[in-house]
Amino acid sequence: MNTLRLNIVTPNGSVYEREDVEMAVLQTTAGEMGIMYGHIPTVAALKTGHVKVNFHNGNEFIAVSDGFIEARQHQLSIIVQTAEPASEIDVERAKLAKSRAESHLEEDDDNTDINRAKRALERANNRLRVAELQ
């Protein structure tokens, strides 16, 4: 069976690479999308969620933030601000981040950046959801 090369890149560089991907399932802004070897060239906007990576002897979940994907016949590139395999998510740290974001949203303070706090809460909740998938 032909397989796909997957590369997930953040501003800090490549954070996940795999050469033997049979299928990657992503949440795009247009809905869920599955990418396999031979997929037509595609560019799509990715929303905060997870990527499910299927390979010969199992699968893995990666928490990702908003970003973009580029699919080619034999390669899938995912460009996001943050990405973290479920196996590496520090659940306690994610719970603290969630609590901090909720506190910022509850503050009645002109200095609170509401949009930033909402994004932080969304990221923390996503990390907690993905950690449970592992």
UniProtKB/Swiss-Prot annotation:
Gene Ontology MF term list: ATP binding; proton-transporting ATP synthase activity, rotational mechanism
Keywords: ATP synthesis, Cell membrane, CF(1), Hydrogen ion transport, Ion transport, Membrane, Transport
Biased composition (Basic and acidic residues): 94-104
Stretches the record annotates as Disordered: 94-115
One Gene Ontology term, aspect cellular component: proton-transporting ATP synthase complex
UniProt subcellular location: Cell membrane
Domain of life where this protein originates: Bacteria
UniProt-listed Pfam families: ATP-synt_DE, ATP-synt_DE_N
Membrane topology: Peripheral membrane protein
InterPro entries: ATP_F1_dsu/esu_C_sf, ATP_synth_F1_dsu/esu, ATP_synth_F1_dsu/esu_N, ATP_synth_F1_esu_C, ATPsynth_dsu/esu_N
Predominant localisation class: membrane
Role: Produces ATP from ADP in the presence of a proton gradient across the membrane.
Similarity-based family: Belongs to the ATPase epsilon chain family.
Assembly notes: F-type ATPases have 2 components, CF(1) - the catalytic core - and CF(0) - the membrane proton channel. CF(1) has five subunits: alpha(3), beta(3), gamma(1), delta(1), epsilon(1). CF(0) has three main subunits: a, b and c.
Name of the molecule in the record: ATP synthase epsilon chain
Organism the protein comes from: Staphylococcus epidermidis (strain ATCC 35984 / DSM 28319 / BCRC 17069 / CCUG 31568 / BM 3577 / RP62A)
